[in-house]
Amino acid sequence: MQLPPLQSATLIRRYKRFLADVQLDNGEVLTIHCANTGAMTGCGEAGDIVWYSHSDSQTRKYPHSWELTELKNGNMVCINTHRSNQLTLEALQNKQIKALAMYEQILPEVKYGEENSRIDFLLKGDGLPDCYVEVKSVTLVKNTIGMFPDAVTTRGQKHLRELIAMKKRGHRAVVFFAGLHNGFDCFKVAEYIDPEYDKLLQEAIQEGVEVYAYAGKFDFSDKKPTALSLTHCVPYIGKK
């Protein structure tokens, strides 16, 4: 996935969930939009290098968007979680996700379920069961272990209940954890943050819901990040 042209700055603070103040190299302070409403644990500390994009839209109050954080250990993380679906769609179209490569039709944002939900992707193929794919962003990493969630997620819990119901109806159901961070080589649920999500995921696995986590990789040109891609499936080390 190609990233928009990016410029770097130093993070001063994030506030009101959607805003952040950053300092440019010339000392100017700029307020930028933050699309990530989560806790952003470990990827939004004062002093971090942030990479932001610019929009020419006349309707936006804040034309700049926080896209990436360059961590003090050198790792990169995409904090714009809107990118996770774009990234996953590209991987599906390119048949990079082997467990799902047999599907030919990819339908985004389809209404489904009993709790007024939308599935990120509904996959269809001749002679194949419909496959419901829910995408989650992996931005939290500790000791090279990618984790989700970074805050209690009642929405994520709802999605697991919906996937369990779809599986019980004879469909395929998948939770896909997309690596927006390039510093992990295995994945688990952050049960210490959201034990209910961990409990529901274990229940989902027992019911036959599939779990896949893919590592992320950034490409650079002239030391600027230019692209993000999913490279390979990493081990899920949670309980099964």
Curated annotation (Swiss-Prot):
Molecular-function GO term, any one: DNA binding
Gene3D superfamilies the record matches: 2.40.50.580, 3.40.1350.60
InterPro entries in UniProt: Ig-like_dom, SfsA, SfsA_C, SfsA_N
Superkingdom of this protein's organism: Bacteria
Family, similarity comment: Belongs to the SfsA family.
HAMAP family, per database record: SfsA
Protein name: Sugar fermentation stimulation protein homolog
